Each structure stands twice: as C-alpha cells, then as structure tokens.
C-alpha cells in the first residue's frame, strides 16, 4: 500500500528513516528498527547502477511471497510458525524436509540464512568488524543469486569482478 503495488517496504523505510553513517536494522513485521553506526574508516564503498530493468509489477515479487508462504504451510505440518524469520538455522535444519517443493525450499533456506546473516552483520558493525561485514554481504549475494534467484547477470558480473580484485573465490 506504500507504493501502490505489491512490494517490500525497505526502500521506502530507508528513505524515510535513514541516517548518515548508519545502517537500519528493521523488523519488517513490527516495523521496529535500530540505527546501527557504520564506521568505514578508510574503506571505500563503490555504488553503481547495473542498468538492469526492475519491474515491481512483473509478478516475480508476488511469486516469491507465495513460495515462502508455501514453505511456511509445509513446515506447519511439523511445527507451527507464522513466518520463516522465526526459525533459527538449527530450527530450519530440523524442519526443512517438510518442504517438498524444491523452489519453496530454496526460498526458505535463503530467508532463514539471511535473517541470521543480518543479525551477524549488525554485530559485526557494532564491533567495527568491517571484514566480517563484507564476508556476510558476499554470502548474501550468493544466496540471493542461488536460492532466491533475484540478482541477474549484470549484478553477478559486478560482484564477481569485485571478488577478483580482492582475491575472493
């Protein structure tokens, strides 16, 4: 309802609540958030545009919402949950076999992993561990590419080029 189409809220939330030199740690269910200081101390950040088309009305977002809902429904056959984000990685490992749809399984694996990566990223930022934060961002990209399937060839090429510059596999 914020943007007039089915979409997430993060872009709009960041525009409304962002603060210089801070990351936003947002609970999309409750809209509770925390501003986490980001200390880059000599680190250069490159922001670029892939010029990839992005269409909120293409149905892909809604497909992923439905796939995640299917995963929740199937998990509910063995453990009651409302959201995938409720599951820790250990919890997910215990219930993942209930997800019989392979696509829904990959989407759920991404969501559960991304929630943990986000928690770990907040801790890394609070501790000033920018190397750990970068590793988590790289893991996030791989999961978005392989499990959530939303990156695209242009973004993948940029990530791979960056990884080569800093000697990552």
Label for each model-derived stretch:
Residues 1-7, 144:
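Acyl-CoA/ACP chain-elongation machinery
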Residues 17-169:
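C-terminal nucleotide
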Residues 14:
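Short, glycine/acidic-enriched loop or turn micro-motifs at the edges of active sites
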């Amino acid at each position: 309802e914020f943007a007039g189409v089915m979409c997430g809220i993060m872009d709009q939330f960041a525009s409304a609540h962002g603060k210089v030199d801070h990351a936003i740690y947002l609970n999309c269910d409750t809209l509770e958030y925390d501003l986490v200081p980001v200390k880059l101390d000599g680190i250069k950040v490159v922001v670029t545009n892939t010029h990839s088309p992005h269409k909120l009305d293409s149905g892909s977002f809604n497909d992923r919402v439905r796939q995640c809902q299917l995963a929740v429904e199937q998990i509910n056959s063995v453990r009651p949950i409302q959201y995938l984000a409720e599951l820790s990685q250990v919890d997910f490992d215990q219930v993942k076999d209930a997800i019989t749809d392979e696509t829904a399984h990959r989407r759920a694996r991404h969501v559960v992993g991304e929630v943990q990566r986000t928690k770990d990223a907040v801790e890394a930022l609070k501790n000033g561990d920018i190397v750990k934060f970068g590793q988590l961002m790289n893991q996030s990209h791989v999961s978005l590419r392989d499990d959530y399937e939303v990156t695209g060839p242009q973004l993948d090429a940029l990530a791979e080029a960056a990884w080569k510059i800093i000697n990552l596999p």
